[in-house]
From Swiss-Prot:
It comes from Escherichia coli O157:H7. Residues 33-48, 98-101, 159-164, 218-224, 284-285, 363-395, 452-471 are cytoplasmic. Its main location: membrane. PANTHER family: BLR6921 PROTEIN (PTHR42718:SF46), MAJOR FACILITATOR SUPERFAMILY MULTIDRUG TRANSPORTER MFSC (PTHR42718). The keyword Cell inner membrane applies. It holds the Pfam family MFS_1. The chain crosses the membrane at residues 12-32, 49-69, 77-97, 102-124, 138-158, 165-185, 197-217, 225-245, 263-283, 286-306, 342-362, 396-416, 431-451. This is Putative multidrug resistance protein MdtD.
Amino acid sequence: MTDLPDSTRWQLWIVAFGFFMQSLDTTIVNTALPSMAQSLGESPLHMHMVIVSYVLTVAVMLPASGWLADKVGVRNIFFTAIVLFTLGSLFCALSGTLNELLLARALQGVGGAMMVPVGRLTVMKIVPREQYMAAMTFVTLPGQVGPLLGPALGGLLVEYASWHWIFLINIPVGIIGAIATLMLMPNYTMQTRRFDLSGFLLLAVGMAVLTLALDGSKGTGLSPLAITGLVAVGVVALVLYLLHARNNNRALFSLKLFRTRTFSLGLAGSFAGRIGSGMLPFMTPVFLQIGLGFSPFHAGLMMIPMVLGSMGMKRIVVQVVNRFGYRRVLVATTLGLSLVTLLFMTTALLGWYYVLPFVLFLQGMVNSTRFSSMNTLTLKDLPDNLASSGNSLLSMIMQLSMSIGVTIAGLLLGLFGSQHVSVDSSTTQTVFMYTWLSMAFIIALPAFIFARVPNDTHQNVAISRRKRSAQ
């Protein structure tokens, strides 16, 4: 990219800045949850909603981000995303109650939902096609560093300052990013078709109320009647979307996507698989601190091997899939992740703390292989005219399933521990043991979906098929 103009390189730095902010925020909060609970006078069982409110908002807003960027302009939307994210960070730091914090996290989520997809769109518009891959590698690298720094930085700030600083550090960064966006980024627009507002609202209502209903009486204090009503509203909203999208060329997500078998299987497997995987980044630092008595900083450091394992495995995923095929890889990694989850619980409860970094490194390797395989399986056979829509739907499902996973993890803690989870409680480790056993079972379930993937589905087979279809 050395032959790119200086202005373009600065624009890529701005996008990379946004990727870093968004990825850092998704991991820095996890380590701080026990301290937040103590500061706000809440049970740790309720703190999963701090993550859910952000991730669910991202899932809801993702479908609108690309259309808004084309309609209003990439600079205007990227600037708005940074401003909303920064304001949300400020309001998070100023929150005095859990409800205030949840609303502020939702505002952060609106900004986070627009930051990454609009950043990708910006790169497509400012960089020549032949340099697009190199440019995307450059801007996504900080996004890979964010999860590496997030847990340890969050623990460090909590231990030596306060949890408020995990949000306050976003403010100067956000101000610089917003000013740089206005000064340096061009405002590309495109002629757009009419936005499917009806479909967007139906999906948003369905996802939001079903997740809220899943949290149930343990997290929200809702009555059984209210929960039943939410489930009914959510199901009706999703059914209405299916009726709305049928034979509708302007639907937010075309039902024609599901005519491709690998897309249907991959999407179902991604949804179920990420529910299980979404539990782990939330539960691991909470367990280390509340269940084992680790300090926030120590718990954050323990998460680094998992990220390193994930980053290291990405280099050889393609060779693994080409050698063994999608079905074998996905079934093996799904069952393997379940076994590693049990291994982590066992070594932790036995007090073999020196083994935990190796177990977490292995967990990161297995999880990364499964994530990459799920993503490529889902999208690889889609025709070109449906590829963009399929990618957007997959991104939305990824965020939604992660929020559901965190919700279920909180629900399991509440189910086994009622309101008595604390470092001083004699039953705490028993509560976590039952929770981790349940998580391992849930993580293993998607293997039944992946077992239905055609046996000849390899990366190289898919490429040859795509070439034949293009001829």
